[in-house]
């Protein structure tokens, strides 16, 4: 028998110490990685619940194990809320991650060797959109489109490549693109060549849910997303679609048993919490502020003479090119880290450095907005970052910024009393 008094603190001091240090880091550091956010205590409560004990292969009402009557209720809640949130007719909440959701889509609708047309990783796409190092680039014939000299997706190039290569599927989505995707144009191109349109909205799902970014569901054959990032839920995946019995059946089979076994019902419960939170009016206010904050930060960098890829942002993220300053993203990342500002190095278009070094930084505002930052704080923060980038090895500047970071983080904690 287990005692509920047997906590990690009592049982495993080494692990508990590391967990506490990470919790302190999250409170004391400013988080600007575009794919990170902070979940609510309710989301974490669901993930740490007794649901982790339950095996439930199959789908609600069609399980291969007994004792699933309550997890059926939980999973159906998550499904229904996801459909309501995004205006979808179909939702599969079982994918363990966004990459697994994407793999399931490929498995459902493609054959090995089929051609896919996706955004180049070097131009802001994602590994799973056909990058050579990913299974999506190994199992399928991946053709890549990119951005033009102004940092915008070249839709004429997308159409030209589609006509030339006749892909079975066109992939729209990104990991580092700061503009609005033209879903109607993607749909028209897909229809012209008889391709499926698959949209990966992992980065902007929260913005879509709040109505501050266009919804791809009415245009795409299938849509995937993660449930963290801007959606602010647990780490996991989600597949959405309009009504199509054939595609729905293929997607369900591709998730289970095609690529996964038992679903993580404790994570699915956390997804249900997340979807309920995203259906509230205050979530729209939050997402509007996320975009305002990103625009405010990008504006400061432009004023200080830095190159923002695409000239600004229309969503939650933007890329900063440091080619002109001859600074590597790796060195900039490390210097900002010493000031308790967490970012990630990122390749930029025409980057002369390797992906392990890069010449750019990616910034995102979901996490700082969750802790209460508004435009004023974000402009001040961007100024501090510019000060460090202007003199990367000046430890006095880094030390001064770190103290300012600690002060503002104490004023605006992630988790209050």
From Swiss-Prot:
(6S)-5,6,7,8-tetrahydrofolate binds at residues 121, 125-127, 354-356. Pathway: One-carbon metabolism; tetrahydrofolate interconversion; Amino-acid biosynthesis; glycine biosynthesis; glycine from L-serine: step 1/1. GO terms for cellular component: cytosol. Its cofactor is pyridoxal 5'-phosphate. Its EC number is 2.1.2.1. It catalyses: (6R)-5,10-methylene-5,6,7,8-tetrahydrofolate + glycine + H2O = (6S)-5,6,7,8-tetrahydrofolate + L-serine. Keywords: Amino-acid biosynthesis, Cytoplasm, One-carbon metabolism, Pyridoxal phosphate, Transferase. GO terms for biological process: glycine biosynthetic process from serine; tetrahydrofolate interconversion. GO terms for molecular function: glycine hydroxymethyltransferase activity; pyridoxal phosphate binding. The modification N6-(pyridoxal phosphate)lysine is found at residue 229. It is found in: Cytoplasm. It comes from the Bacteria. Gene3D superfamilies: Aspartate Aminotransferase, domain 1 (3.90.1150.10), Type I PLP-dependent aspartate aminotransferase-like (Major domain) (3.40.640.10). The record marks 228 as: Plays an important role in substrate specificity. InterPro entries: PyrdxlP-dep_Trfase (IPR015424), PyrdxlP-dep_Trfase_major (IPR015421), PyrdxlP-dep_Trfase_small (IPR015422), Ser_HO-MeTrfase (IPR001085), Ser_HO-MeTrfase-like (IPR049943), Ser_HO-MeTrfase_PLP_BS (IPR019798), SHMT-like_dom (IPR039429). Homodimer. Belongs to the SHMT family. Catalyzes the reversible interconversion of serine and glycine with tetrahydrofolate (THF) serving as the one-carbon carrier. This reaction serves as the major source of one-carbon groups required for the biosynthesis of purines, thymidylate, methionine, and other important biomolecules. Also exhibits THF-independent aldolase activity toward beta-hydroxyamino acids, producing glycine and aldehydes, via a retro-aldol mechanism. PANTHER family: SERINE HYDROXYMETHYLTRANSFERASE. NCBIfam families: PRK00011.1. This is Serine hydroxymethyltransferase 1. It comes from Pseudomonas savastanoi pv. phaseolicola (strain 1448A / Race 6) (Pseudomonas syringae pv. phaseolicola (strain 1448A / Race 6)). The gene is glyA1.
